Regions:
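N-terminal hydrophobic targeting/anchoring segments and the immediately downstream early-domain regions
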Residues: 16-162
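Bacterial N-terminal signal peptides
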Residues: 5-14
Length: 162
């Protein structure tokens, strides 16, 4: 009985061959893929970086890992701006104020460079900005310190674009 399965397995394997022609289309290269598809980075620490060292990320910068020219070169369409609050600031009671300042910095980038960046509070806005050739700057809060134990602050930060 055991030897009966060997011819059956061989017959099944032989029937698994493909008569398809080899693919003749040239595959897309990295740049073509970046131009065609939306690329999202879910964590960019630019707001806190700018809080510590103000600079214009709409042009090439010498420090940090994000600026407009590098985003364009890498095909980055939607870098989530991380509203990061260090634990010490939370302990000192200044978390909400710092979060507001960091959100203001992101909004300032958009105001300063409306030809390069746009706000994005939904996937539809990210898609529309992509089609318009703008880099979306959605925001995400890295920790809950700015909520300060008050659930009303969840709505407050939602209204601010988080």
């Amino acid at each position: 009985m055991r030897y009966l399965f060997i011819p059956i397995i061989l017959a099944v394997l032989a029937s698994c061959g493909s008569d398809l022609e080899p693919q003749t289309a040239t595959p897309l290269n990295g740049q073509q893929l970046a131009d065609k598809y939306l690329i999202v980075d879910t964590h960019i620490d630019v707001p806190f970086r700018l809080h510590r060292q103000p600079q214009d990320v709409g042009v090439a910068t010498d420090s940090g890992e994000f600026d407009y020219p590098r985003a364009v070169a890498g095909g980055l369409n939607a870098p989530f701006m991380s509203i990061y609050i260090p634990a010490q600031v939370e302990e000192d009671g200044g978390a909400k104020a710092l979060a507001d300042e960091l959100i203001d910095l992101v909004e300032g980038i958009i105001r300063q460079h409306p030809d390069k960046f746009a706000a994005a509070h939904s996937t539809a806005q990210i898609d529309a900005n992509f089609k318009a050739g703008l880099i979306s700057l959605p925001m995400g809060m890295e920790n809950g310190g700015p909520i300060q134990g008050d659930l009303n602050n969840v709505s407050y930060f939602f209204d601010r674009g988080i």
